[in-house]
Curated annotation (Swiss-Prot):
Homodimer which binds Holliday junction (HJ) DNA. The HJ becomes 2-fold symmetrical on binding to RuvC with unstacked arms; it has a different conformation from HJ DNA in complex with RuvA. In the full resolvosome a probable DNA-RuvA(4)-RuvB(12)-RuvC(2) complex forms which resolves the HJ. It comes from Campylobacter jejuni subsp. doylei (strain ATCC BAA-1458 / RM4099 / 269.97). NCBIfam families: ruvC. Its cofactor is Mg(2+). The keyword DNA damage applies. It is found in: Cytoplasm. The lineage of its organism: Bacteria, Pseudomonadati, Campylobacterota, Epsilonproteobacteria, Campylobacterales. The gene is ruvC. The keyword S-adenosyl-L-methionine does not apply. This is Crossover junction endodeoxyribonuclease RuvC. Mg(2+) 1 binds at D9, D141.
Amino acid sequence: MNLKILGIDPGSKNCGYAIIERSKGKNILIEAGLIKIKPSTLQYQITELCEGLDLIFKNHSFDEVAIEDIFFAYNPKTVLKLAQFRGALSLKILQIHGDFAEYTPLQVKKAVTGKAKATKEQVAFMVKRLLGLSKDIKPLDITDAIAIALTHAANLRTRV
C-alpha cells in the first residue's frame, strides 16, 4: 500500500514542506519546497502562509500530515510570532485535511540521525542518504520538512 505524507517545517520567514511516498518499504521524495513569506504585517504573513498551504493541498492529496512543534526560543516575541503562525497552520490543516501528527525537533533529529542533539547539517546529510539523493537539498528548511515526513513514516511503521 502506498502512503503519501506531507511534512511541514513552520517558520515566520520560510515554511519548508516535503511530500514523500512510502511504497514497498521505501520512502520516495515526490516534491519539496518553500512557502516564502515576505516581510510585512503579521496578518499578511499569516495569510501568505495559509494561501501557500492551500496551493499544496490543491495540487496533492495526502494520507498523513506531520508538522514540527515549536522549539524553545529565548526571545518571547519570536515565540509569540511562531505560535501565531503555527496556530494558523494547524487550523488550516484541520480544515482541509483533518488530524495531523506533531514532532519536536529532538524527536525528528533522533529519528533521522539517531542523535537528539544532531546539527541541521547532520540531519541534511542523513536525509540525503536515507532517500538516496545525489544532490544536496537547500535550504535547510526543506531538509527539515523532509526529516519531519521521514520521522512520521518511521513512526507509522512502528505502530503497524
